[in-house]
């Protein structure tokens, strides 16, 4: 209820007040640099919170990852980026609070609460003998920067307390994570990069850097409820100015045309599986991206028609305004009787039968 009210207020207070975007931030990509390269060692088959001292959540405290190593070792990694809204100014960050954890200090207890959801969904259930993920190392990247995991900026939004800063450091945090994760899993052969909502956007926008960091592994992408469409009106300018997002340098058009990222990834990484899960008229994305009524439906249809024509780019799309499909991983069934679980498993295993569902 609180999130729904915040989203309603977001629409009412901001739809007509988009400032003109400032200068374009420079794109950036490549292998991560800086930070520790020490491997992470934690007990197998249990979740451990691993803070990284050089990283920052929104309030300036350390960010980190949750790690659940496979028993007996593995050359497979499931890397999941968490979602939880976004914020880009004083109203969204501190009044409406439309992004999770930007004022929180992340802890082991919070990690356990969040990863329990993944197990309940079925993604990290090691007891499911049908799961292609059951013997993989699990890595969970919490979301505490409000920037779709791709920001590289520190902002002072509180004019009454100018010393209060918000760290939109999702991209630089990911740099640090990748350095140590590569050292922890140097022999990885398969990496599944997944995310829901804000995490789905982070997964898509970070795919190039993850693939470069794990250059010896096959990296495949699954973005849930994260249609890579352009926000409406001036909203993308507001977000871009706040976050200074880290965009792949190979995608020269991405700063002004986000769907072009999929074209770039499909060309740069041929044969990699690029999957999308979506509700075609997602109401949550409609509000965050400032679309008029029905606008997300048209934007989604355009994305599917123009970007998901590449070899190995596929979608599982349901009609409606709901948000997040992976919560129904074990129960959702799409057109033609195709279950979401079977579709995701086909994506994960490279099944030639993997195809569009709508």
Report each predicted region and the residues it spans:
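C-terminal motif of bacterial Sec signal peptides marking the signal peptidase cleavage site
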Residues: 13-15
């Amino acid at each position: 209820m609180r999130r729904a009210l915040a989203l309603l207020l977001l629409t009412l207070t901001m739809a007509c007040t988009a400032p003109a975007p400032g200068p374009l931030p420079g794109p950036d990509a490549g292998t991560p640099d800086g930070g520790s390269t020490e491997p992470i060692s934690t007990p197998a088959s249990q979740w451990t919170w691993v803070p990284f001292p050089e990283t920052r959540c929104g309030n300036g405290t350390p960010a980190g990852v949750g790690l659940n190593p496979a028993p007996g070792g593995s050359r497979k990694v499931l890397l999941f980026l968490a979602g939880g809204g976004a914020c880009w100014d004083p109203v969204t960050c501190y009044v409406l609070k439309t992004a999770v954890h930007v004022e929180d200090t992340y802890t082991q207890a919070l990690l356990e609460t969040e990863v329990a959801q993944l197990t309940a969904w079925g993604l990290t259930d090691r007891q499911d003998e049908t799961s292609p993920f059951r013997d993989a190392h699990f890595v969970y990247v919490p979301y505490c920067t409000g920037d779709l995991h791709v920001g590289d900026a520190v902002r002072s939004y509180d004019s009454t307390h100018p010393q209060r800063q918000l760290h939109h450091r999702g991209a630089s945090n990911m740099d640090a994570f990748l350095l140590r994760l590569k050292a922890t899993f140097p022999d990885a052969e398969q990496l599944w990069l997944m995310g829901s909502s804000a995490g789905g956007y982070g997964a898509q926008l970070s795919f190039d850097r993850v693939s470069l960091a794990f250059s010896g592994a096959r990296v495949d992408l699954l973005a849930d409820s994260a249609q890579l469409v352009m926000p409406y009106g001036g909203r993308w300018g507001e977000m871009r100015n706040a976050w200074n997002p880290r965009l792949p340098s190979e995608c020269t058009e991405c700063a002004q045309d986000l769907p072009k990222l999929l074209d770039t990834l499909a060309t740069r990484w041929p044969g990699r599986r690029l999957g999308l899960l979506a509700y075609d008229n997602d109401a949550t994305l409609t509000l965050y991206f400032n679309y008029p009524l029905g606008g997300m439906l048209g934007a989604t249809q355009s994305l599917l028609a123009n970007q998901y024509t590449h070899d190995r780019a596929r979608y599982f799309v349901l009609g409606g305004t709901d948000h997040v499909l992976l919560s129904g991983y074990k129960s959702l069934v799409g057109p033609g009787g195709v279950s979401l679980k079977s579709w995701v498993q086909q994506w994960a295993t490279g099944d030639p039968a993997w195809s569009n569902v709508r």
